[in-house]
């Protein structure tokens, strides 16, 4: 059965509604702000982050010439059934908003890349709290990107992708609740689950499996990966690569009922990837749609 995705177009910033059946695309939000990156739906409202407007070096082409360290990112909202867009956190409230997720109970979580942190806020804009802050001295190694939450087990997962194509990416886990007497800069419950990854980006937790996109160097980068969620105090098993050949893989949505994962990339593609042992396992991956502009965040409409 055909379902719908929400996908983010980076430049110019738009929220797109995409049919998984025929690839039909239309804009849900025509002006989504500067460089939208992470998106999630909670209670029929779409929420997304923006990275903000970068400072550009005209002598350095591409992403390498874009500096997002200026604090002008935000978190934004739009009701799916129509209405007026609103600011959950206005531009400048965060530094560089990356993947966004929800606990399904009115709290949003996201990675702030140049801000070196994982934060949360209620959907009404109250209760802004940092859960993890990495040392500024870690530089690019401390930049937080992807995020997933497991409210049932009380866990938070996130990626630190490291330098581009650098093979120094990591995935961490910590508690959703702060240990007594500790703070976001110094937590005793942080676990390093995977290290030495090509360049992990967005996460999706589905039951006992953790899925992630990776935009690092081939052969293990520009891939969709999954691995079993490690037991507390243990490291993750080597990931299983489910699909390769993406053009800078970013966004990720998993439809476990249909046995499909959807991946968006900076090449403008949204690809459907059948999951092992699922109802579509006999199929090969296929493109749902190819658009002329880069795509980042992705979520499945409930």
Please describe what each predicted stretch is:
Residues 1-5, 32-44, 91-107, 137-155, ...:
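Beta-rich, blade/repeat-based domains predominating
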Residues 19-23, 78-84, 122-126, 175-180, ...:
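Short loop/turn segments that connect beta-strands within beta-propeller blades
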Residues 1-27:
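An edge-strand/N-cap motif at the start of beta-rich repeat modules
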Residues 264-302:
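Blade-level signature of beta-propeller repeat domains, shared across WD40, Kelch, NHL, RCC1
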Residues 14-24, 37, 41-47, 74-76, ...:
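Flexible "stalk/tail and boundary" regions
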Residues 24-30, 84-90, 127-138, 188-194, ...:
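A short beta-strand motif characteristic of beta-propeller blades
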Residues 5-11, 47-58, 66-69, 110-114, ...:
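Conserved beta-strand positions in repeat-built beta-propeller and related beta-rich domains
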Residues 12-17, 56-76, 116-119, 165-174, ...:
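Structural motif
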